[in-house]
Amino acid sequence: TVTGLEKAAPPAFYPASAPDVRISAISAASVGLLKSLGVWDAIRAMRVHAYRRLETWEWESAHVAFDAAELKLPELGYMVENKVLQWGLWQALAAHEAVTLRVGSELKTMQRGETQTALHLREGETIHARLVIGADGANSQVREMAGIGVHAWQYQQSCMLISVECADDPGDSTWQQFTPSGPRAFLPLFDHWASLVWYDAPARIRQLQSMTMAQLQQEIASHFPARLGRVTPQAAGAFPLTRRHALQYVQPGLALVGDAAHTIHPLAGQGVNLGYRDVDALLEILAEARGRGEDWASLPVLKRYQARRRADNFIMQSGMDLFYAGFSNDLAPVRMLRNIGLMAAERAGGLKRQALKYALGL
Protein backbone atom coordinates (compact mmCIF):
# COMPACT_ATOMS: atom_id res chain seq x y z
CA THR A 1 0.00 0.00 0.00
CA VAL A 2 1.02 3.61 -0.61
CA THR A 3 0.21 6.67 1.49
CA GLY A 4 0.57 10.11 -0.10
CA LEU A 5 0.97 13.14 2.16
CA GLU A 6 -0.15 16.40 0.57
CA LYS A 7 -0.80 19.81 2.15
CA ALA A 8 -3.63 20.57 -0.28
CA ALA A 9 -5.38 18.85 -3.18
CA PRO A 10 -4.78 20.44 -6.60
CA PRO A 11 -7.67 22.54 -7.94
CA ALA A 12 -10.14 20.75 -10.21
CA PHE A 13 -9.84 21.38 -13.95
CA TYR A 14 -12.54 23.40 -15.72
CA PRO A 15 -12.54 23.29 -19.57
CA ALA A 16 -13.64 26.94 -19.83
CA SER A 17 -10.75 28.19 -17.65
CA ALA A 18 -7.85 30.27 -18.99
CA PRO A 19 -4.54 28.38 -19.22
CA ASP A 20 -2.23 27.97 -16.25
CA VAL A 21 0.82 30.25 -16.60
CA ARG A 22 3.00 27.24 -15.75
CA ILE A 23 3.45 25.01 -18.81
CA SER A 24 5.49 21.82 -19.22
CA ALA A 25 6.87 20.59 -22.54
CA ILE A 26 6.23 16.87 -22.08
CA SER A 27 8.60 14.69 -24.12
CA ALA A 28 7.76 11.48 -25.99
CA ALA A 29 9.37 9.43 -23.18
CA SER A 30 7.28 11.21 -20.53
CA VAL A 31 4.12 10.54 -22.54
CA GLY A 32 5.18 6.87 -22.61
CA LEU A 33 5.43 6.83 -18.79
CA LEU A 34 2.04 8.51 -18.38
CA LYS A 35 0.51 5.97 -20.80
CA SER A 36 2.03 3.06 -18.85
CA LEU A 37 0.50 4.47 -15.65
CA GLY A 38 -2.89 4.70 -17.36
CA VAL A 39 -3.29 8.47 -16.96
CA TRP A 40 -2.40 9.89 -20.37
CA ASP A 41 -5.86 9.46 -21.91
CA ALA A 42 -7.45 11.46 -19.06
CA ILE A 43 -4.82 14.21 -19.38
CA ARG A 44 -5.21 14.33 -23.16
CA ALA A 45 -9.00 14.56 -22.81
CA MET A 46 -8.57 17.74 -20.74
CA ARG A 47 -6.20 20.01 -22.64
CA VAL A 48 -2.88 19.34 -24.39
CA HIS A 49 -1.24 20.73 -27.52
CA ALA A 50 1.15 18.70 -29.68
CA TYR A 51 4.33 20.40 -30.89
CA ARG A 52 6.12 19.04 -33.93
CA ARG A 53 8.93 21.52 -34.48
CA LEU A 54 11.49 23.18 -32.21
CA GLU A 55 13.56 26.13 -33.44
CA THR A 56 16.32 28.18 -31.82
CA TRP A 57 18.46 31.05 -33.09
CA GLU A 58 20.28 34.26 -32.25
CA TRP A 59 21.16 35.47 -35.73
CA GLU A 60 18.61 34.52 -38.39
CA SER A 61 21.48 33.06 -40.43
CA ALA A 62 22.38 30.75 -37.54
CA HIS A 63 19.10 28.91 -37.11
CA VAL A 64 18.67 25.36 -35.74
CA ALA A 65 15.39 23.50 -36.28
CA PHE A 66 14.38 20.07 -34.99
CA ASP A 67 11.45 18.41 -36.69
CA ALA A 68 9.38 15.39 -35.59
CA ALA A 69 9.53 14.14 -39.19
CA GLU A 70 13.35 13.80 -38.88
CA LEU A 71 12.81 11.07 -36.29
CA LYS A 72 9.69 9.72 -38.03
CA LEU A 73 7.60 10.71 -35.02
CA PRO A 74 4.03 12.09 -35.13
CA GLU A 75 5.11 14.81 -32.64
CA LEU A 76 8.11 15.81 -30.51
CA GLY A 77 5.92 16.12 -27.44
CA TYR A 78 3.05 18.03 -25.90
CA MET A 79 2.59 21.37 -24.17
CA VAL A 80 0.61 20.61 -21.02
CA GLU A 81 -0.46 22.99 -18.29
CA ASN A 82 0.88 22.02 -14.87
CA LYS A 83 -2.62 22.17 -13.37
CA VAL A 84 -3.82 19.65 -16.00
CA LEU A 85 -0.96 17.24 -15.22
CA GLN A 86 -1.51 17.58 -11.48
CA TRP A 87 -5.27 17.06 -11.67
CA GLY A 88 -4.97 14.04 -13.98
CA LEU A 89 -2.39 12.35 -11.75
CA TRP A 90 -4.30 13.25 -8.58
CA GLN A 91 -7.51 11.68 -9.90
CA ALA A 92 -5.64 8.49 -10.83
CA LEU A 93 -4.12 8.27 -7.33
CA ALA A 94 -7.48 8.96 -5.67
CA ALA A 95 -9.09 6.15 -7.69
CA HIS A 96 -6.31 3.60 -6.98
CA GLU A 97 -7.33 0.97 -4.42
CA ALA A 98 -3.80 0.62 -3.00
CA VAL A 99 -3.31 4.37 -2.46
CA THR A 100 -4.43 6.48 0.51
CA LEU A 101 -4.19 10.25 0.02
CA ARG A 102 -3.94 12.30 3.20
CA VAL A 103 -4.79 15.91 2.40
CA GLY A 104 -3.81 18.54 4.95
CA SER A 105 -1.15 16.28 6.49
CA GLU A 106 2.22 17.81 7.16
CA LEU A 107 5.47 16.11 8.09
CA LYS A 108 6.92 17.24 11.43
CA THR A 109 9.89 14.89 11.93
CA MET A 110 11.27 11.71 10.40
CA GLN A 111 13.11 8.93 12.26
CA ARG A 112 14.86 6.03 10.59
CA GLY A 113 14.64 2.68 12.39
CA GLU A 114 16.26 -0.62 11.42
CA THR A 115 13.77 -1.59 8.75
CA GLN A 116 11.25 1.27 8.72
CA THR A 117 11.02 5.04 8.91
CA ALA A 118 8.66 6.70 11.39
CA LEU A 119 6.97 9.77 9.91
CA HIS A 120 5.63 11.99 12.70
CA LEU A 121 2.86 14.27 11.43
CA ARG A 122 1.97 17.72 12.77
CA GLU A 123 -1.51 16.48 13.65
CA GLY A 124 0.07 14.06 16.16
CA GLU A 125 -0.15 10.81 14.20
CA THR A 126 2.78 8.58 13.20
CA ILE A 127 3.04 6.58 9.97
CA HIS A 128 5.60 3.79 9.54
CA ALA A 129 6.99 3.29 6.04
CA ARG A 130 9.38 0.79 4.53
CA LEU A 131 10.27 3.26 1.77
CA VAL A 132 9.90 7.05 1.86
CA ILE A 133 9.93 8.79 -1.52
CA GLY A 134 10.64 12.52 -1.37
CA ALA A 135 8.77 14.00 -4.34
CA ASP A 136 8.13 17.25 -2.50
CA GLY A 137 9.80 19.77 -4.76
CA ALA A 138 12.85 22.00 -4.82
CA ASN A 139 12.58 22.97 -1.13
CA SER A 140 12.10 19.34 -0.10
CA GLN A 141 11.30 18.74 3.58
CA VAL A 142 12.13 15.05 3.16
CA ARG A 143 15.60 15.92 1.83
CA GLU A 144 16.19 18.39 4.66
CA MET A 145 15.00 16.02 7.40
CA ALA A 146 17.17 13.24 5.96
CA GLY A 147 20.17 15.58 6.28
CA ILE A 148 20.98 15.41 2.56
CA GLY A 149 22.90 18.46 1.38
CA VAL A 150 22.67 20.17 -2.00
CA HIS A 151 25.11 21.80 -4.37
CA ALA A 152 23.30 24.97 -5.47
CA TRP A 153 23.64 28.40 -6.98
CA GLN A 154 21.38 31.18 -8.21
CA TYR A 155 21.53 32.15 -11.89
CA GLN A 156 21.78 35.88 -12.62
CA GLN A 157 18.45 35.63 -14.39
CA SER A 158 14.77 35.41 -13.52
CA CYS A 159 12.01 34.02 -15.69
CA MET A 160 8.61 35.47 -16.54
CA LEU A 161 5.78 33.31 -17.89
CA ILE A 162 3.05 35.14 -19.80
CA SER A 163 -0.25 33.64 -21.01
CA VAL A 164 -1.26 35.35 -24.24
CA GLU A 165 -4.08 35.21 -26.78
CA CYS A 166 -2.75 35.22 -30.36
CA ALA A 167 -4.28 37.04 -33.32
CA ASP A 168 -2.92 34.22 -35.52
CA ASP A 169 -3.11 30.44 -35.07
CA PRO A 170 -0.24 29.54 -32.68
CA GLY A 171 0.59 26.47 -34.80
CA ASP A 172 2.68 23.50 -33.66
CA SER A 173 6.19 25.01 -33.58
CA THR A 174 7.88 26.09 -30.35
CA TRP A 175 10.80 28.49 -30.67
CA GLN A 176 13.44 30.29 -28.67
CA GLN A 177 15.45 33.35 -29.65
CA PHE A 178 18.65 34.11 -27.76
CA THR A 179 19.29 37.77 -26.93
CA PRO A 180 22.11 39.41 -24.92
CA SER A 181 19.81 39.85 -21.89
CA GLY A 182 18.33 36.34 -22.06
CA PRO A 183 16.20 34.06 -24.25
CA ARG A 184 12.65 34.78 -25.44
CA ALA A 185 10.54 31.69 -26.01
CA PHE A 186 7.15 30.85 -27.52
CA LEU A 187 5.09 27.78 -26.54
CA PRO A 188 1.92 27.15 -28.61
CA LEU A 189 -1.17 26.06 -26.67
CA PHE A 190 -4.79 25.12 -27.41
CA ASP A 191 -7.18 27.29 -29.46
CA HIS A 192 -5.56 30.73 -29.85
CA TRP A 193 -3.59 30.61 -26.61
CA ALA A 194 0.18 30.52 -26.21
CA SER A 195 2.72 30.94 -23.45
CA LEU A 196 5.66 33.33 -23.68
CA VAL A 197 8.81 32.86 -21.61
CA TRP A 198 10.97 35.92 -20.96
CA TYR A 199 14.37 35.45 -19.31
CA ASP A 200 16.12 38.58 -18.08
CA ALA A 201 17.98 40.20 -15.18
CA PRO A 202 15.96 39.94 -11.91
CA ALA A 203 15.52 43.75 -11.72
CA ARG A 204 14.13 43.83 -15.28
CA ILE A 205 11.68 40.99 -14.53
CA ARG A 206 10.51 42.83 -11.38
CA GLN A 207 9.93 45.91 -13.56
CA LEU A 208 7.86 43.85 -16.04
CA GLN A 209 5.85 42.37 -13.15
CA SER A 210 4.85 45.85 -11.99
CA MET A 211 3.32 46.73 -15.39
CA THR A 212 -0.31 46.60 -16.47
CA MET A 213 -1.20 44.08 -19.19
CA ALA A 214 -1.42 46.93 -21.72
CA GLN A 215 2.11 48.09 -20.83
CA LEU A 216 3.37 44.51 -20.93
CA GLN A 217 1.84 44.11 -24.40
CA GLN A 218 3.95 47.05 -25.64
CA GLU A 219 7.11 45.55 -24.11
CA ILE A 220 6.41 42.19 -25.77
CA ALA A 221 5.93 43.91 -29.16
CA SER A 222 9.29 45.70 -28.72
CA HIS A 223 11.35 42.77 -27.44
CA PHE A 224 10.01 39.60 -29.10
CA PRO A 225 10.74 38.77 -32.77
CA ALA A 226 8.27 39.92 -35.43
CA ARG A 227 7.21 36.33 -36.21
CA LEU A 228 5.27 36.33 -32.91
CA GLY A 229 2.56 38.50 -34.47
CA ARG A 230 0.01 40.37 -32.40
CA VAL A 231 -0.62 38.91 -28.94
CA THR A 232 -2.68 40.07 -25.95
CA PRO A 233 -1.28 39.14 -22.52
CA GLN A 234 -3.87 37.90 -20.02
CA ALA A 235 -1.84 36.66 -17.04
CA ALA A 236 1.79 36.48 -15.92
CA GLY A 237 3.97 35.04 -13.17
CA ALA A 238 7.70 35.11 -12.43
CA PHE A 239 10.28 33.14 -10.48
CA PRO A 240 14.06 33.22 -9.83
CA LEU A 241 16.24 30.54 -11.43
CA THR A 242 18.23 28.24 -9.16
CA ARG A 243 20.33 25.18 -9.93
CA ARG A 244 20.35 22.51 -7.22
CA HIS A 245 21.69 18.98 -7.11
CA ALA A 246 21.32 16.74 -4.05
CA LEU A 247 24.66 15.30 -2.92
CA GLN A 248 22.93 11.91 -2.78
CA TYR A 249 19.55 10.68 -3.97
CA VAL A 250 19.15 7.76 -1.56
CA GLN A 251 19.56 6.48 1.99
CA PRO A 252 18.34 3.16 3.44
CA GLY A 253 14.56 3.25 2.96
CA LEU A 254 14.55 6.68 1.27
CA ALA A 255 14.75 8.03 -2.29
CA LEU A 256 14.48 11.53 -3.75
CA VAL A 257 12.88 12.12 -7.16
CA GLY A 258 12.30 15.13 -9.40
CA ASP A 259 12.93 18.63 -8.11
CA ALA A 260 13.67 17.26 -4.62
CA ALA A 261 16.81 15.72 -6.16
CA HIS A 262 17.68 18.29 -8.85
CA THR A 263 16.56 21.54 -10.42
CA ILE A 264 17.77 22.79 -13.77
CA HIS A 265 17.80 25.98 -15.83
CA PRO A 266 14.43 25.75 -17.68
CA LEU A 267 16.07 26.80 -20.97
CA ALA A 268 15.09 23.62 -22.84
CA GLY A 269 12.02 22.73 -20.77
CA GLN A 270 13.67 19.54 -19.49
CA GLY A 271 12.93 19.88 -15.74
CA VAL A 272 9.70 17.89 -15.58
CA ASN A 273 10.98 15.31 -18.08
CA LEU A 274 14.05 14.60 -15.94
CA GLY A 275 11.74 14.09 -12.96
CA TYR A 276 9.64 11.63 -14.97
CA ARG A 277 12.81 9.79 -16.00
CA ASP A 278 13.61 9.46 -12.27
CA VAL A 279 10.16 7.97 -11.61
CA ASP A 280 10.49 5.56 -14.55
CA ALA A 281 13.92 4.36 -13.37
CA LEU A 282 12.84 3.97 -9.72
CA LEU A 283 9.73 1.98 -10.70
CA GLU A 284 11.79 -0.34 -12.90
CA ILE A 285 14.51 -0.92 -10.28
CA LEU A 286 12.01 -1.58 -7.46
CA ALA A 287 10.04 -4.02 -9.66
CA GLU A 288 13.23 -5.88 -10.66
CA ALA A 289 14.35 -6.14 -7.02
CA ARG A 290 10.94 -7.44 -5.90
CA GLY A 291 10.95 -9.97 -8.73
CA ARG A 292 14.34 -11.27 -7.55
CA GLY A 293 13.20 -11.46 -3.92
CA GLU A 294 15.59 -8.70 -2.81
CA ASP A 295 14.94 -6.20 -0.03
CA TRP A 296 13.68 -3.51 -2.41
CA ALA A 297 13.97 -0.67 0.16
CA SER A 298 17.60 -1.51 0.99
CA LEU A 299 20.49 0.82 0.22
CA PRO A 300 22.17 -1.49 -2.36
CA VAL A 301 18.93 -1.60 -4.41
CA LEU A 302 18.24 2.13 -4.11
CA LYS A 303 21.85 2.91 -5.08
CA ARG A 304 21.11 1.35 -8.49
CA TYR A 305 18.50 4.06 -8.97
CA GLN A 306 21.00 6.75 -7.94
CA ALA A 307 23.65 5.33 -10.28
CA ARG A 308 21.22 5.29 -13.20
CA ARG A 309 19.87 8.81 -12.73
CA ARG A 310 22.46 11.06 -11.10
CA ALA A 311 24.90 11.16 -14.03
CA ASP A 312 22.13 11.73 -16.60
CA ASN A 313 20.70 14.61 -14.56
CA PHE A 314 24.18 16.10 -14.12
CA ILE A 315 24.85 15.94 -17.87
CA MET A 316 21.58 17.75 -18.63
CA GLN A 317 22.24 20.36 -15.90
CA SER A 318 25.75 20.97 -17.22
CA GLY A 319 24.51 21.24 -20.80
CA MET A 320 22.01 23.92 -19.76
CA ASP A 321 24.75 25.71 -17.79
CA LEU A 322 26.95 25.77 -20.90
CA PHE A 323 24.11 27.26 -22.93
CA TYR A 324 23.38 29.78 -20.18
CA ALA A 325 27.04 30.84 -19.90
CA GLY A 326 27.65 30.83 -23.65
CA PHE A 327 24.56 32.88 -24.52
CA SER A 328 24.77 35.30 -21.56
CA ASN A 329 28.01 36.78 -22.89
CA ASP A 330 27.79 39.76 -25.24
CA LEU A 331 31.46 39.85 -26.32
CA ALA A 332 31.64 39.91 -30.13
CA PRO A 333 34.04 36.90 -30.48
CA VAL A 334 31.83 34.81 -28.17
CA ARG A 335 28.69 35.80 -30.11
CA MET A 336 30.39 34.80 -33.37
CA LEU A 337 31.54 31.45 -31.96
CA ARG A 338 28.12 30.51 -30.59
CA ASN A 339 26.38 31.39 -33.85
CA ILE A 340 28.94 29.35 -35.80
CA GLY A 341 28.12 26.55 -33.33
CA LEU A 342 24.39 26.86 -34.10
CA MET A 343 25.10 26.81 -37.86
CA ALA A 344 27.23 23.68 -37.41
CA ALA A 345 24.50 22.05 -35.30
CA GLU A 346 21.92 22.66 -38.04
CA ARG A 347 24.17 20.86 -40.55
CA ALA A 348 25.21 18.04 -38.21
CA GLY A 349 22.67 15.51 -39.54
CA GLY A 350 23.07 12.31 -37.49
CA LEU A 351 24.54 14.11 -34.47
CA LYS A 352 21.61 16.52 -34.46
CA ARG A 353 19.16 13.60 -34.52
CA GLN A 354 21.03 11.89 -31.65
CA ALA A 355 20.89 15.09 -29.56
CA LEU A 356 17.15 15.35 -30.19
CA LYS A 357 16.58 11.69 -29.28
CA TYR A 358 18.50 12.19 -26.02
CA ALA A 359 16.45 15.27 -25.12
CA LEU A 360 13.22 13.37 -25.85
CA GLY A 361 14.38 10.43 -23.73
CA LEU A 362 14.28 8.01 -26.69
Give residue spans per PLM region.
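Short beta-strand to alpha-helix junction loop
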Residues: A25-A28, E70-Q91, A203-A214, L241
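FAD/FMN-dependent oxidoreductases across multiple families
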Residues: R206-A297
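Glycine-rich FAD pyrophosphate-binding loop
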Residues: T1-R22
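N-terminal FAD cofactor-binding segment of flavoenzymes
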Residues: S17-E58
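A general structural signal for well-ordered alpha-helical segments in protein cores
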Residues: S27-V31, N82-Q86, W90, Q157, ...
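C-terminal helical "tail/cap" subdomain of flavin- and related membrane-associated enzymes
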Residues: E284-L362
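Conserved FAD-binding catalytic core of PHBH/FMO-like flavoproteins
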Residues: L34, G124-E125, L131-A236, L241
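Conserved N-terminal helical subregion
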Residues: M46-M145, W153-S158
